[in-house]
């Protein structure tokens, strides 16, 4: 009975093929090719992945590149940083490394397109958190990729704006360098260390108006001491760094300095005294105290009780006090000018910050 079925099945197969031809269906080469591909699952996945990546690149290329339309870039960068933060927060010792590496790659590309003043505060905060997370990475992961990323990041830092958060960036780099010293003696450790040294030097060479630990205001740099000296020694401390015990030239400068002093709740020397002639107040640069500045004395001051010949910031105004008393002090000097990239590149990098000796 099985022998009689085979001719019948062959006849049915021929009939079905004829019917398919009747409605215009043919087994084309493309159809056969697709059938062949479906037998190779990994290859199909690769083709689909390539198609998706190509579409993503097309979409990225449509992001506006002009500075006036830079907001979309900034938002994308900020989203990438947020995703990176989330990935880092979920780290176990040997997981999520591939995701972090991919996020770092995208972040590097985004930093290269940053306008000069966009999202710097957010980037700084994310870098701070990332530094802490890097210290928890397993000993052997992605060192070669990290080395390459640091090399390219150094070039990106060279394009950062000259000011904005330089002090914080410098401190973060210093701490990161110390963390690298504790890495296991694995591949590329020496190269990573050298890259960090060069990156730190590049940040130090960025043109900045004031040295580290000084405050910039209206073309001048101010150093607020953290130790105390008498009035004469305060003058010496400022002179040793090419500055002067502060001489106030305008109402705006007075308001700025008074605010700094009152916030810290400190008694602070200024460069004003009547040592040469009682009752005739004179600045350390030889200029007299203008009548319009007398309004800044506290009520009842100066009163010269017990030979009080030197002026200080006290509360919300000025007070006269004995010059031999130890108090905080403020130094002032002109800010550096930055004429362009040539001056920035030629200026030597300081080996250490240079506040007055305390």
Swiss-Prot record:
InterPro entries: C-type_lectin-like, C-type_lectin-like/link_sf, C-type_lectin/snaclec_domain, C-type_lectin_CS, CD209-like_CTLD, CTDL_fold. Disulfide bonds join 210-221, 238-331, 310-323. Glycans are attached at residue 80. Residues 336-358 are annotated as: Disordered. Signal peptide: none annotated. It is found in: Membrane. Sequence repeats lie at residues 96-118, 119-141, 142-164, 165-187, 188-211. Its main location: membrane. Gene3D superfamilies: Mannose-Binding Protein A, subunit A. Ca(2+) binds at residues 301, 303, 305, 308, 319-320. Residues 96-280 are annotated as: 5 X approximate tandem repeats. It is a single-pass type II membrane protein. The chain crosses the membrane at residues 38-58. Keywords: Adaptive immunity, Calcium, Cell adhesion, Disulfide bond, Endocytosis, Glycoprotein, Immunity, Innate immunity, Lectin, Mannose-binding, Membrane, Metal-binding, Receptor, Repeat, Signal-anchor, Transmembrane, Transmembrane helix. One of its GO terms (cellular component) is membrane. A motif (Endocytosis signal) lies at residues 14-15, 16-18, 31-34. Residues 217-332 form the C-type lectin domain. CDD domains: CLECT_DC-SIGN_like (cd03590). Residues 59-358 are extracellular. Residues 1-37 are cytoplasmic. One of its GO terms (molecular function) is metal ion binding. The tandem repeat domain, also called neck domain, mediates oligomerization. Pathogen-recognition receptor expressed on the surface of immature dendritic cells (DCs) and involved in initiation of primary immune response. Thought to mediate the endocytosis of pathogens which are subsequently degraded in lysosomal compartments. The receptor returns to the cell membrane surface and the pathogen-derived antigens are presented to resting T-cells via MHC class II proteins to initiate the adaptive immune response. Probably recognizes in a calcium-dependent manner high mannose N-linked oligosaccharides in a variety of pathogen antigens. On DCs it is a high affinity receptor for ICAM2 and ICAM3 by binding to mannose-like carbohydrates. May act as a DC rolling receptor that mediates transendothelial migration of DC presursors from blood to tissues by binding endothelial ICAM2. Seems to regulate DC-induced T-cell proliferation by binding to ICAM3 on T-cells in the immunological synapse formed between DC and T-cells. Homotetramer. Interacts with C1QBP; the interaction is indicative for a C1q:C1QBP:CD209 signaling complex. Interacts with ICAM2 and ICAM3 by binding to mannose-like carbohydrates. Interacts (via C-type lectin domain) with CEACAM1 (via Lewis X moieties); this interaction is regulated by the glycosylation pattern of CEACAM1 on cell types and regulates contact between dendritic cells and neutrophils. This is CD209 antigen. It comes from Papio hamadryas (Hamadryas baboon).
């Amino acid at each position: 009975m099985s022998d009689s079925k085979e001719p019948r099945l062959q006849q049915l197969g021929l009939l079905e093929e004829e019917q398919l031809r009747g409605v215009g269906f043919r087994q084309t080469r493309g159809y056969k090719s697709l059938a062949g591909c479906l037998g190779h699952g990994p290859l199909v996945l690769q083709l689909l992945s390539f198609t998706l990546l190509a579409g993503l690149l097309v979409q990225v290329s449509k992001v506006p590149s002009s500075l006036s339309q830079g907001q979309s870039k900034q938002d994308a960068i900020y989203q990438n940083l947020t995703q990176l933060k989330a990935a880092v927060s979920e780290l176990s010792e040997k997981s999520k490394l591939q995701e972090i590496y991919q996020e770092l790659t995208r972040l590097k590309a985004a930093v290269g397109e940053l306008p000069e003043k966009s999202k710097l505060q957010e980037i700084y905060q994310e870098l701070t958190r990332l530094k802490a997370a890097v210290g928890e990475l397993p000993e052997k992961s992605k060192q070669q990729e990290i080395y390459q990323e640091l090399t390219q990041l150094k070039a990106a830092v060279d394009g950062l704006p000259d000011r904005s958060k330089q002090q914080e960036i410098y401190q973060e780099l210093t701490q990161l360098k110390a963390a690298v010293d504790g890495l296991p003696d694995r591949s590329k450790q020496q190269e990573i260390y050298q890259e960090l040294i060069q990156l730190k030097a590049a940040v130090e060479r960025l043109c900045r108006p004031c040295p580290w630990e000084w405050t910039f205001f209206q073309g001048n740099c101010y150093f607020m001491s953290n130790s105390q000296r008498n009035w004469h020694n305060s003058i010496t401390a400022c002179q040793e760094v090419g500055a002067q015990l502060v001489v106030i030239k305008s109402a705006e400068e007075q308001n700025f300095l008074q605010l700094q002093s009152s916030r810290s709740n400190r008694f602070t020397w200024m460069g004003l005294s009547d040592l040469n002639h009682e009752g005739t107040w004179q600045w350390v640069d030889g200029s007299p105290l203008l009548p319009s500045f007398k309004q800044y004395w506290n009520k009842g001051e100066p009163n010269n009780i017990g030979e009080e010949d030197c002026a200080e910031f006290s509360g919300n105004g000025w007070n006269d006090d004995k010059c031999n008393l130890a108090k905080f002090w403020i130094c002032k000097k002109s800010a550096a000018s930055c004429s362009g990239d040539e001056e920035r590149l030629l200026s030597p990098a300081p080996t250490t910050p240079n506040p007055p000796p305390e």
